[in-house]
């Protein structure tokens, strides 16, 4: 694996010179191998190690290099044709392979090659970009988008129209991460490498980026870029220092544990916020 990483790192340093016409065989094979490993879930752009999320930047570099070495090509679709550098993940799947890998794909869901989809996942008409990782038992609901390199945990529900931000550039940026057993409400947007920690519930229409204040009303604490585990979050506002205006924020209205989540439905958690 170190040799593969070295090839990617070296090629990335001269990425501006690489084109589909002049890409050498070693670089091309290394990039294609990484994309295949991401596609199968053998590698992932980010993973939790000793309780901390670690981003493997060299894998992001491989994804970016794939756009340098590949030319646009015609891609066949059910209702139309497309013209892009990245083929679709399921282009060569037959019924036996779908059965073996054990997930459902409802038309016209679109998944790019290089994204991993785990068993018992359901993809409603949605979009999953290259480098993303969608773990077991997750529902990606209608018109939800999982951005490039985003990491989605086990038993997550991404409701209708949810946007999970992608991140390929700038290179140092970390991917957006939704940990296990989270619920993201309809039309919410989680972007810019924000981490939603395990067991959290995000209400409908909540927008969280790195600069969004995440206000805990019980403690008065303000978080940035991270929703603490077990949080129930709704949209809100905080007043300015002079009291003349207010600005948008996300509000943690309560904390719940796994036991409470098991006894109480998502709707009840969101309705009883007073």
From Swiss-Prot:
Gene Ontology MF terms: 2,3,4,5-tetrahydropyridine-2,6-dicarboxylate N-succinyltransferase activity; nucleotidyltransferase activity
Pfam families recorded: Hexapep_2, THDPS_N_2
Alphabetical list of Gene3D superfamilies matching this protein: Hexapeptide repeat proteins, Tetrahydrodipicolinate-N-succinyltransferase, N-terminal domain
Signal peptide coordinates: none
PROSITE patterns, alphabetized: HEXAPEP_TRANSFERASES
SUPFAM superfamilies from the UniProt entry: Trimeric LpxA-like enzymes
Principal location class: cytoplasm
InterPro entries linked to this entry: DapD_Trfase_Hexpep_rpt_fam, Hexapep, Hexapep_transf_CS, THP_succinylTrfase_dom1, THP_succinylTrfase_N_sf, Trimer_LpxA-like_sf
Localization per Swiss-Prot or TrEMBL: Cytoplasm
UniProt protein name: 2,3,4,5-tetrahydropyridine-2,6-dicarboxylate N-succinyltransferase
Source species: Escherichia fergusonii (strain ATCC 35469 / DSM 13698 / CCUG 18766 / IAM 14443 / JCM 21226 / LMG 7866 / NBRC 102419 / NCTC 12128 / CDC 0568-73)
């Amino acid at each position: 694996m170190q040799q593969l990483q070295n090839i990617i790192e070296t090629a990335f340093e001269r990425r501006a010179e690489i084109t589909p016409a002049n890409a050498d065989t070693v670089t091309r094979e290394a990039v294609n191998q990484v994309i295949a490993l991401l596609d199968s879930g053998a590698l992932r752009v980010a993973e939790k190690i000793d309780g901390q999320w670690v981003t493997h930047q060299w894998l992001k570099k491989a994804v970016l290099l794939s756009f340098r070495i590949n030319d646009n090509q015609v891609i066949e679709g059910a209702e139309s044709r497309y013209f892009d550098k990245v083929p679709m993940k399921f282009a060569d799947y037959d019924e036996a392979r779908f059965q073996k890998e054990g997930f459902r794909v409802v038309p016209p869901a679109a998944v790019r090659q290089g994204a991993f989809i785990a068993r018992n996942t359901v993809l409603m008409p949605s979009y999953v970009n290259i480098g993303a990782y969608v773990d077991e038992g997750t529902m990606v609901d209608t018109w939800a988008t999982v951005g490039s390199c985003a990491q989605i945990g086990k038993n997550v529900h991404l409701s209708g129209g949810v946007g999970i931000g992608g991140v390929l550039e700038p290179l140092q940026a970390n991917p957006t991460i939704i940990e296990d057993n989270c619920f993201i409400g309809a039309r919410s947007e989680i972007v810019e490498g924000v981490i939603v920690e395990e067991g959290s519930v995000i209400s409908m229409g909540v927008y969280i980026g790195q600069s969004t204040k995440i206000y805990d009303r019980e403690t008065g604490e303000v978080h940035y870029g991270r929703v603490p585990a077990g949080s129930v979050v709704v949209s809100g506002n905080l007043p300015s220092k002079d009291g003349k205006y207010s600005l948008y924020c996300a509000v943690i209205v309560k904390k719940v544990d796994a036991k409470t989540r098991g006894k109480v439905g998502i709707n009840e958690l969101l309705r009883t916020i007073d």
